[in-house]
Amino acid sequence: MAGMALARAWKQMSWFYYQYLLVTALYMLEPWERTVFNSMLVSVVGMALYTGYVFMPQHIMAILHYFEIVQ
């Protein structure tokens, strides 16, 4: 049973990866170009998440102070 569930999960992840390749047109690139693109994408998303994690609390507190919700 666990083997079947694992195979099904693997098939689903393969389908999502295939869809990602088609939507972003990465299937036309060579493997090294695909690696460069994916590395840059992961870097940009990582920096965006980090920036949101670091600066969002400050901005939220500034908004709350501006509308006098928090003193």
Curated annotation (Swiss-Prot):
The keyword Magnesium belongs to this UniProt entry's keyword annotation: no
Pathway linked to the protein: Lipid metabolism; sphingolipid metabolism
GO cellular component: endoplasmic reticulum; endoplasmic reticulum membrane; serine palmitoyltransferase complex
Domain of life of the source: Eukaryota
Molecular function terms, GO-annotated: serine C-palmitoyltransferase activity
Entry keywords, A to Z: Endoplasmic reticulum, Lipid metabolism, Membrane, Sphingolipid metabolism, Transmembrane, Transmembrane helix
Subcellular location: Endoplasmic reticulum membrane
Protein name: Serine palmitoyltransferase small subunit A
Native source species: Rattus norvegicus (Rat)
Encoding gene (name): Sptssa
